[in-house]
Amino acid sequence: MLPSLAQWLQTLSPEFGFLRVFQYLTFRAVMAALTALLMGLAAGPFVIRRLTELKIGQPIRGYGMDSHLSKSGTPTMGGALILLCIVIATLLWVDLSNRFVWIVLLVTLGFGAIGWVDDWRKVVNKDPEGMRSHEKYFWQSFIGLLAALYLVFSISENSNMRVLELFFSWVRSGFDLNLPPKAGLLLPFFKEISYPLGVLGFVILSYLVIVGASNAVNLTDGLDGLAIMPVVLVGSCLGIFAYVTGSAVYSKYLFFPHIPGAGELLIFCSAMSGAGLAFLWFNTHPAQVFMGDVGALALGAALGTVAVIVRQEIVLAIMGGVFVVEALSVMLQVSWFKFTKKRSGQGRRLFKMAPLHHHFEKSGWKETQVVVRFWIITMLLCLVGLSTLKLR
């Protein structure tokens, strides 16, 4: 919004020439991060007080860690504050005509709505199960598939009209359409090498990345500050990839596919990082507020959607390795328990407790040790991910 306003003012008088600074992505990215950060810090105490007054407190599982019982009643659903800061900061500083920003915002808010309903049922309606798993996965799949279907054509074309034309061309051709190389699966550390996916392959991969990232972040959000800092780190790095991909000069120099308009996602990623840091101010141990599913599901989906647009699905898995391992630990734990129970009549566990961060707590690690060490691991993985910018 502000870039459009600045451009309009410049047409009125040359005295507004200093507003040309609003044309620069880097300036707007910094301002978006600061806007989200300051908004979050200012509104945080009010939101926490309000959640406390409404008795929207986090229920703690009786079979979990004993050290977590003291957290019972801590305000939750604080992720709504994160989303509010992201949306306002993004809309203020982004080019509102950019279609990629709108699709990321819609996916983020869609998954946030799913998380809101889940949290509301758990906390307000006192339903320990919240939204039923099949219901949750249905809506996640619905939003994820719609986004994937739009993106498969949007990445190949530069306007929504051309996206529609390409879609109908795909339908008329009997669902057989050759996509450009930039719509393939890019392999990191290799120059201009991509694996062709086709429309169906692209949609399936994008769906798995968006929905998988959403649930992986949600599973990671089990300790004070554990999920939000990796989200900030990975989101910031994805913003750099968006900047490179959206630039004709940098993408050519670094052998990346050029996707016009993707650079504006740097604004969204910066806003997400700023809002995340503001939330961490109140979420650090001992946490004053939890983000809840409304925040975790939305932020994970946002990371996944941005990664799909900038064609860095594999790099997302690298940088978000903590999220990947946390999700895998749950799947392995459940699968192994069912397998051993079916085979011997008694279920066995691979880990002392899943997700993995609880395994380390059961092994004697302090909560803060688990959190900070997972942060350090994420920092290292993000450096590996960023190295793919040049090591190609």
Curated annotation (Swiss-Prot):
Gene Ontology molecular function, alphabetical: metal ion binding; phospho-N-acetylmuramoyl-pentapeptide-transferase activity; UDP-N-acetylmuramoyl-L-alanyl-D-glutamyl-meso-2,6-diaminopimelyl-D-alanyl-D-alanine:undecaprenyl-phosphate transferase activity
Protein's pathway: Cell wall biogenesis; peptidoglycan biosynthesis
Domain of life: Bacteria
Chief location: membrane
Keywords: Cell cycle, Cell division, Cell inner membrane, Cell membrane, Cell shape, Cell wall biogenesis/degradation, Magnesium, Membrane, Metal-binding, Peptidoglycan synthesis, Transferase, Transmembrane, Transmembrane helix
Places the protein is found: Cell inner membrane
Membrane topology value: Multi-pass membrane protein
Cofactor(s), by name: Mg(2+)
Keyword Zinc listed: no
Residues passing through the membrane, by range: 28-48, 76-96, 100-120, 137-157, 193-213, 225-245, 262-282, 289-309, 314-334, 369-389
One annotated Gene Ontology cellular component of this protein: plasma membrane
Listed EC numbers: 2.7.8.13
Reaction catalyzed: UDP-N-acetyl-alpha-D-muramoyl-L-alanyl-gamma-D-glutamyl-meso-2,6-diaminopimeloyl-D-alanyl-D-alanine + di-trans,octa-cis-undecaprenyl phosphate = di-trans,octa-cis-undecaprenyl diphospho-N-acetyl-alpha-D-muramoyl-L-alanyl-D-glutamyl-meso-2,6-diaminopimeloyl-D-alanyl-D-alanine + UMP
GO biological process, one term: cell wall organization
Biological role: Catalyzes the initial step of the lipid cycle reactions in the biosynthesis of the cell wall peptidoglycan: transfers peptidoglycan precursor phospho-MurNAc-pentapeptide from UDP-MurNAc-pentapeptide onto the lipid carrier undecaprenyl phosphate, yielding undecaprenyl-pyrophosphoryl-MurNAc-pentapeptide, known as lipid I.
Similarity remark: Belongs to the glycosyltransferase 4 family. MraY subfamily.
Name this protein carries in UniProt: Phospho-N-acetylmuramoyl-pentapeptide-transferase
Organism taxonomic ancestry: Bacteria, Pseudomonadati, Pseudomonadota, Betaproteobacteria, Burkholderiales
Gene name linked to the record: mraY
